């Protein structure tokens, strides 16, 4: 197949990220990339990089994602940018979809049946899926000749066994209402697994890994024989690790209890657990770990406590996944913003594991701070590899989109 132009779209509740690629198998060139922010306001911003230039438009009246798409098209095709000459040059559009439920085990070409299924599970990701669906529908109007592909953050985890994904709630909740662990960050984990296989020169099917995706949102994935075996996020991204603003694991009775005490609805309490908890909640200052480290290094109590709680939770999950994988793993990998740049978090997360042969090289670890560079930070005496690998979720979407277009 000749080089084709593919547009990658990542729809947020008030933003639209995009990258335009010229792509041929395992060879990609970025033609343009950018973001439209503050959608649904009169202060919207468009930032776009192309041909070593940066274009920024501010104070735009963009009241909907539909209008944002029209601005995007205008920006890609106008005489000033000349990124593409006409819309039909774009042959494929890959969408990142937060939640695919249990229906979508792989990326798929979008048709009306796929859209109907997505609408049925919109309640599982009410902040993201409905807007993504609207964007897809608008894209069918704007790009009638392009094939659209849905790539799901949940698909990677569809290989989990029932013992890993079921909650110990009435079984009818699962059968009738699809209440179960789905997991997220799947596009990241798929990329990291594939990349680790290349680095270690092993077949993917032979890989057992523990991958830590540590950013403002954070999760851990146990990988057995190259497939997702267990993960920390659940029905929603709220379960699991302590995150920037999310609480992670809590006793569920806290919700009705605090609802009664604070005289707030359960929806309001859920919002607090999602947006006012985690590192922000404990530190009482910030969800940004860089800010928290400044305070922690000045011996500020809550900031130190936030780091301790965060890394303690990570250690517990690493230990439990080591046991779940029968202590048979090839590597532990750190990825995403915090995972690739914060050597202290990596050190604290693995503290104590040297007693079972998982040994970090402190000097290598301290030097591993470039978010765009891969590192091996394991000691020569370590029984397994400890790696730092920047993730590339867009590349997973790009490759899946290309493969599906090529074969259909």
Curated annotation (Swiss-Prot):
Q: Name one GO molecular function term.
A: ATP binding
Native organism is Borrelia recurrentis (strain A1)
Family the UniProt entry places it in: Belongs to the acetokinase family.
The record lists the lineage as: Bacteria, Pseudomonadati, Spirochaetota, Spirochaetia, Spirochaetales
Top-rank lineage group of the source organism: Bacteria
Q: Which reaction does it catalyse?
A: acetate + ATP = acetyl phosphate + ADP
Q: What is this protein called?
A: Acetate kinase
* Enzyme Commission number: 2.7.2.1
Q: Quick one: which residues bind Mg(2+)?
A: 10, 393
State its role. Answer: Catalyzes the formation of acetyl phosphate from acetate and ATP. Can also catalyze the reverse reaction.
The cofactor note from the UniProt entry for this protein is: Mg(2+). Can also accept Mn(2+).
**UniProt keyword Magnesium, yes or no:** yes
What Pfam families does its record include? Acetate_kinase (PF00871)
Q: How does it assemble?
A: Homodimer.
Q: Which GO terms describe its cellular component?
A: cytoplasm
Record: residues binding ATP: 17, 213-217, 288-290
Q: What is its main location?
A: cytoplasm
- Listed Gene3D superfamilies: 3.30.420.40
PROSITE patterns registered for this protein in UniProt: ACETATE_KINASE_1 (PS01075), ACETATE_KINASE_2 (PS01076)
Q: Which GO terms describe its biological process?
A: acetate metabolic process; acetyl-CoA biosynthetic process
PANTHER family, per database record: ACETATE KINASE, ACETATE KINASE-RELATED
The gene designation is ackA
Q: Where in the cell is it found?
A: Cytoplasm
């Amino acid at each position: 197949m000749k080089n084709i132009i593919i547009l990658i779209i990542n729809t947020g509740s008030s933003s639209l990220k995009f990258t335009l690629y010229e792509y041929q198998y395992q060879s990609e060139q970025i033609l343009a990339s950018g973001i439209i922010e503050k959608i649904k306001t009169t202060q919207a911003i468009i930032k776009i990089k192309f041909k070593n230039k940066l274009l920024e438009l501010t104070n735009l009246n963009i009241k909907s994602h539909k209008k944002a798409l029209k601005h995007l098209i205008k920006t890609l095709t106008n005489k000033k940018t000349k990124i593409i000459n006409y819309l039909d040059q774009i042959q494929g559009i890959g969408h990142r979809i937060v939640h695919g439920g249990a229906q979508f085990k792989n990326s798929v070409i979008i048709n009306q049946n796929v859209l109907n299924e997505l609408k049925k599970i919109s309640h599982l990701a009410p902040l993201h899926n409905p807007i993504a669906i609207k964007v897809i529908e608008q894209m069918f109007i704007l790009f009638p000749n392009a094939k659209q592909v849905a790539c799901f953050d949940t698909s990677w985890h569809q290989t989990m066994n029932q013992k890993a994904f079921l909650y110990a709630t009435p079984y009818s909740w699962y059968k009738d209402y699809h209440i179960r662990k789905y997991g997220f960050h799947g596009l990241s984990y798929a990329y990291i697994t594939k990349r680790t296989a290349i680095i270690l020169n092993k077949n993917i099917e032979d890989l057992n890994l523990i991958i830590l995706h540590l950013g403002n949102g954070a999760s851990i994935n146990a990988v057995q024989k190259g497939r997702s075996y267990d993960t920390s996020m659940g029905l929603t991204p709220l379960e699991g690790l302590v995150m920037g603003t999310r609480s992670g694991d809590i006793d569920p009775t806290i919700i009705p209890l605090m609802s009664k005490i604070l005289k707030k609805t359960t929806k309001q309490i859920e919002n607090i657990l999602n947006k006012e908890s985690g590192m922000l909640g404990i530190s009482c200052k910030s969800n940004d770990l860089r800010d928290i480290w400044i305070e922690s290094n000045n011996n500020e109590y809550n900031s130190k406590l936030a780091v301790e709680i965060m890394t303690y939770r990570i250690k517990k999950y690493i230990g439990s996944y080591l046991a779940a994988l029968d202590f048979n793993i090839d590597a532990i990998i750190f990825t995403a913003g915090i995972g690739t740049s914060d050597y202290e978090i990596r050190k604290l997360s693995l503290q104590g594991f040297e007693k079972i042969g998982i040994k970090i090289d402190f000097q290598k670890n301290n030097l591993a701070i470039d978010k765009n560079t891969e590192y091996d930070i394991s000691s020569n005496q370590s029984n397994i590899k400890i790696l730092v690998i920047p993730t590339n979720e867009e590349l997973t979407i790009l490759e899946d989109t290309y493969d599906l277009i090529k074969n259909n």
